[in-house]
Design a protein with these regions (language model features):
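Conserved beta-loop-beta element that borders a ligand/cofactor-binding pocket
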Residues: 130-160, 164, 169
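Substrate-positioning beta->alpha
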Residues: 92, 153-154, 173-195
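N-terminal Rossmann NAD(P)H-binding glycine-rich loop of SDR-like oxidoreductase domains
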Residues: 2-22
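Conserved Rossmann-fold NAD(P)-dependent oxidoreductase catalytic core, especially the SDR/UDP-sugar
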Residues: 27, 73-74, 82-145
Length: 198
């Protein structure tokens, strides 16, 4: 059994689809009850809770041998900041995984994650990675680039801007290279690493 945190999110839906396509049993950890409809077609188990709740996570991990941790935020809100969700949340998920004897922990980080507080999002993702690395668990960390697909917020917004205006935005004076990846490709890669922990 595989537990996917953030299963109802943009990446989570693709991961769940890829895992189920490969015949894997999946339990989805979802915070907001009505969001299960986004993965209901895949015939998965549901567990509800918050990644900041150790007891909810441990309950969801019973009978699970692999955890795919996808919960993260890319924009801060009043009650959710990068440190709380991306760092502390990952620490709590790894603690629950360790205490429940999880065999393999798969963590989704971000391309460019770094130990530099000048970039709060990337720094929080790096701190999350450190929590995974120091957890004692067998782990795999993914650092995908910007992802596109149904429901993405970046590429679709960029495409809309290009359609609306005759200008194409240039990132970093044109010297920064972006190599977007399909969210379905990310889901497929995560589903493949489940059987090959490294």
């Amino acid at each position: 059994m595989i537990l996917v945190t953030g299963a109802s999110g943009f990446v989570g839906r693709s991961v769940v689809k890829a895992l189920r396509t490969r015949g894997k049993e999946v339990r989805c950890f979802i915070r907001t009850p009505y969001r299960e409809k986004t993965v209901a077609d895949y015939h998965v188990e549901m567990a509800y809770g918050d990644i900041l709740s150790l007891s909810a996570l441990k309950g969801a991990m019973r009978g699970v041998d692999t955890v795919v941790h996808l919960v993260a935020i890319i924009r801060e809100k009043r009650n959710e900041n990068f440190d709380l969700i991306n760092r502390r949340g990952t620490e709590i998920v790894t603690q629950a995984a360790r205490e429940e004897g999880i065999r393999h922990f798969v963590h989704m980080s971000a391309n460019g994650a770094q130990d530099n507080p000048s970039y709060p999002y990337l720094h929080s993702k790096w701190q999350g990675e450190q929590a995974v690395i120091s957890s004692g668990l067998t782990y795999t960390i993914f650092r995908p680039s910007i992802q596109f697909g149904d429901g993405d917020e970046f590429i679709n917004t960029l495409a809309g801007m290009i359609k609306a205006f005759p200008l194409v935005p240039v990132v970093g004076l044109g010297k920064i290279r972006l190599q977007p990846i399909s969210v379905d490709e990310v889901g497929a890669m995560i589903s493949l690493v489940i059987d090959n922990p490294r």
